[in-house]
Curated annotation (Swiss-Prot):
One of its GO terms (cellular component) is plasma membrane. One of its GO terms (biological process) is respiratory electron transport chain. Its EC number is 7.2.1.1. Keywords: Cell inner membrane, Cell membrane, Flavoprotein, FMN, Ion transport, Membrane, NAD, Phosphoprotein, Sodium, Sodium transport, Translocase, Transmembrane, Transmembrane helix, Transport, Ubiquinone. Belongs to the NqrB/RnfD family. Disulfide bonds: none annotated. The keyword Transport applies. Its cofactor is FMN. This is Na(+)-translocating NADH-quinone reductase subunit B. It is a multi-pass membrane protein.
Length: 503
């Protein structure tokens, strides 16, 4: 029956006035059955797997990230939008799988989470495929070429890079830009220089920055979430320093001014975590001994929040740490990121129980996809490994150089340089970009040496943008797009080196 339906479409398109729609019939036939034509442009597959099946393998690899995008967006919308401070406290203090499952089944409900998450993610997915597909069909009809299968991957990658609160018309505009400008204008699938999904996100990021950053990471109605957080903070008596918020790790990192030093963070951590030794302990104790002359009987690890703020913001001449009073909340927030306190714990970052773009939060889900892509030979493990090495080494060098240059274990170096290098791999969209974006076979290099250099370059630029550039909290998107631009050049020099070695 399906074959008869496809044949009937072919018969209709054979008529003169419908011949321009032949690419549509060909696309339907190719989607349902094996294509009858050979690939004329890259990527070329030298086995029985055609491009459609090859693209479907990438979609399968995205299943874990897609499921967790639905799950996390659902539970976060329910908790943050509940207006219940006790529910929020219970959610933020989950410490293991047993307590997490207990929270889900006793306080929220599994089906409520899935239903809420589907209402957030599925409309964006439908818009992505519908608008992107319409653009593909339009260009195929006008140019009289076949409709390629590239949209199968682009259509699901794109919504996974968006915040859940993005307006639908903006999502449609972004995918249209990605398909038309970054792909079709270059000749279609296999000819594009830039990753179409990332290009669409970059277009939205620079055109509508207020909708792509800030308090946009929970639910589908930012106003409702904001009112709910205000209600919860008022009920729990929270201040701006320790109150509930939508801040992400990278937003906290980006908003931390250079005047917040490592010694400020270490002093706060020693109080919160009751640590007996932090890297700058000697400098802190030296200052604290002077400060306690006017505040007798106080212990560093037993200060109240007001006393801690007084110590950290008092002038150096009085035994304080010299932080501006208006920047104490920034120092308090970055302490959670550096030391993995509360919602920014390493476990939450790895498993994905954090705020962020829909598909980027879970490093675990991305690793599952990476294993599948490497085993099937779809993605290059060289690009993944070199990307991770480049990011890790760059973050580690920032820390080491800060210690060597500033002295005293980097006490007076900017605090943002001391995030553990391994935690940089869990933050933001690094894992998602490493697995699914940087390994795009069309916009990434093809030579082995070029792949190593390409990955190292992207990892290096990601950390540079995160730590140095004050305008952009996340560097993965810009780093990958910049790497795409240099990919042909890297391949060119890699080929020259290979030829010289052969000679």
């Amino acid at each position: 029956m399906l074959k008869r339906f496809v044949n009937s479409i072919w018969e209709i398109c054979q008529k003169d006035k419908f011949q321009r729609f032949t690419p549509v019939a060909d696309a339907i036939d190719t989607f349902c059955y094996e294509p009858i034509h050979q690939a004329s442009s890259p990527p070329f597959i030298r086995d029985a797997v055609d491009i459609k099946r090859w693209m479907m393998l990438v979609v399968i690899a995205l299943f874990p990230a897609t499921f967790l995008a639905i799950w996390n967006s659902g539970i976060q919308a329910l908790v943050y939008g509940s207006g219940n401070a006790q529910l929020m406290e219970a959610f933020l203090h989950i410490s293991g799988f047993r307590s997490y499952l207990s929270f889900i089944f006793n306080d929220i409900g599994m089906f409520s989470v899935l239903w809420t998450g589907c209402k957030i993610f599925l409309p964006l997915l439908i818009i992505s495929y519908t608008v992107g597909g319409a653009c593909e069909v339009l260009f195929a009809v006008i140019r009289k070429h076949k409709i390629a299968e590239g949209l199968l991957v682009t259509g699901i990658l794109y919504p996974l890079t968006l915040p859940p609160t993005i307006p639908y018309w903006m999502a449609a505009l972004g995918i249209a830009f990605g398909v038309v400008v970054s792909k079709e204008l270059f000749g279609g699938t296999g000819m594009n220089i830039l990753n179409p999904a990332l290009s669409g996100r970059a277009f939205l990021f620079f055109t509508f920055p207020a909708k792509m950053s800030g308090d946009v990471w929970v639910g589908s109605n930012p106003t409702h979430i904001k009112d709910s957080l205000l209600t919860m903070n008022a009920t729990a008596g929270k201040s701006i320093i320790d109150g509930f918020s939508q801040s992400t790790c990278l937003q906290t990192l980006n908003s931390t001014p250079p005047s917040v030093k490592r010694i400020h963070v270490d002093a706060i951590a020693s109080n919160i975590l009751h640590m007996t030794h932090v890297p700058t302990q000697n400098v802190i104790e030296s200052q604290f001994s002077i400060w306690t002359e006017s505040h007798p009987g106080l212990l560093l690890d037993k200060l109240t929040l007001e006393q801690l703020q007084s110590f950290v913001t008092s002038p150096l001449s009085e035994g304080g740490l010299g932080l501006l009073p208006t920047q104490f909340d920034s120092a308090y927030a970055i302490t959670d990121v550096i030391y993995g306190i509360g919602k920014f714990s390493s476990g939450n970052l790895f498993w994905g129980n954090i705020l962020g773009s829909l598909g980027e939060t879970s490093t675990f889900a991305c690793l599952l996809g990476a294993v599948f892509l490497v085993i099937t030979g779809i993605a290059s493990w060289r690009t993944m490994v070199s990307f991770g090495i480049g990011a890790f080494v760059t973050a580690w060098l920032f820390k080491i150089c800060s210690i060597l240059i500033a002295g005293k274990h980097g006490a007076w170096a900017p605090a943002k340089f001391f995030i553990p290098a391994y935690r940089q791999l869990f933050l933001g969209g690094l894992a998602f970009g490493l697995v699914f974006m940087a390994t795009d076979p069309v916009s990434s290099p093809t030579m082995k040496l070029a792949k190593w250099i390409y990955g190292l370059f992207i990892g290096f630029m990601t950390i540079i943008i995160r730590l140095i550039n004050p305008a952009y909290p996340e560097g993965v998107m810009l780093a990958i797009l910049l790497g795409n631009v240099f990919a042909p050049l890297l391949d060119y020099f890699a080929v020259r080196k290979y030829r010289r070695r052969r000679i």
